[in-house]
């Protein structure tokens, strides 16, 4: 579970803007406040196609943050960041309405616990055995490419390295 001193602040997204809203939630962990409108502009999100992974990464770079991102991630990768690094993890996954971003805040033996900007309550639980089946989203021109197991971790410590292979931005 993430540190109690730095709880995530839940935020309800505007329609189509789960990416900027998830960034807002994750940034609250670091006591960094940005409006959804500002993050929408930085990510270049739009209601029709949402937010590209690339836009999420560029937005964090523009506010002097760093990003670790990875495709084809595993539940063990999520556990590493939540339990060992004590960092929230943004994931792209497939909800009932389509592809969606949320912030993983905890993991236990049964569930993945999300701070989901589409939900009124601050925690949403998805069965651990179900999550890998829905952990995909659509990216690229007109959302024509499937991205499996994408995750993104924000941090503000220059030069930080993790024990998982992925891309640093």
For the regions a protein language model found, what residue spans apply to each?
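Noncatalytic regulatory segments and standalone regulatory/sensor domains
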Residues: 1, 43-49, 83-86, 107-169
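Helix-adjacent hinge/juxtasegments
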Residues: 58-82
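A glycine-rich, hydrophobic loop/mini-helix early in the fold
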Residues: 49-60
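A short, Trp-centered hydrophobic/proline-enriched beta-strand micro-motif
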Residues: 88-91
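Active-site-adjacent structural segments surrounding the nucleophilic cysteine of cysteine proteases
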Residues: 1-49, 95, 108-110, 156-169
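Generic structural signal for hydrophobic residues
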Residues: 22-23, 55-56, 113
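Short, surface-exposed coil-to-beta transition loops
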Residues: 97-102
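Active-site-proximal beta-strand/loop segments in catalytic clefts of secreted hydrolases
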Residues: 72-73, 93-94, 116-118
